[in-house]
Amino acid sequence: MLATKLARRRQVPEQGVRVLAAAGSFAAIATLLGSPLTGAFLLMEAAGLGGPMLGLVLLPGLLAAGIGSLIFIGLDNLTGLGTFSLALPGLPGFGQPTVAEFGWAIVIGVAAALVGPGIRWLARFLQTYADKWTMIVVPLAGVAVAVLAIIYAEATGKATSDVLFSGQNELDPLITHAASYSVGALVLLLACKGLAYGVSLSSFRGEPIFPAMFIGAVGGIALSHLPGLPLIAGVAMGIGAMSVVMLTLPLTSVLLATLLLASDGLAVMPLVIVAVVVAHVAAARIAPRPAAQSAGSEHAGRGAHTDSAAQA
């Protein structure tokens, strides 16, 4: 937005305005995800960039994302604002994929393809009322999310933040302390978070990425209690599958899941790819979207709840 306003004030040609707007978006998404490359892939997939336009937008976008990262990392005597990375420290190691884990990749992909469209259906159903009676439905939506958080907290003894917020800050504690969550608590968290996600999509603004990742991680942890599925593999496949169902961005979803696991990312990547592809294809068959709807456009207006939106 700032890049676009500056360009229009300087009377930059319309094509230049688009390039500057894209560069600003690259930098913003790269900061949010803690990785310039992930931000670049996300925007390229979401915008459907290709051909000559790809080079025109990609180079200034990568430059803006790189400079933005330097501001946070620091340079020489400049300490920077502090780094953020999707990678989670202290996770248990992952060896080599097994046949059973590839079977679980298919199961997780199909499960995500069933859960994701349900969340979107709830969001679209409620949005028809939110558009007509905004001043009534939006406060009621906030109350509904709060009630879901209270039900979860009272039943499990866990923090309400697991349900209330986007999941960006809660993802690390969830995976690190996964052993402290019973299967019942995980199933209840999955239900409450999914309902809160759908309600928030219908009425509030925000980004859809971290709620999808959090729900996928919860599902993967719950399934890891069953034989043949290690925790790390379940989390990675759940995150990738749920992300692609909600974002419809396969490459970005694979990167999000593998970057999260740092050194284990390469080892678990084949499983994530299978889960993402199965989820993407199954979701397209179960709940096909209109051809005119571009990837990610569903989230351009109203969106999932973020930490800042929830606190506001």
Give residue spans per PLM region.
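Alpha-helical transmembrane segments and immediately membrane-proximal extracytoplasmic
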Residues: 1-312
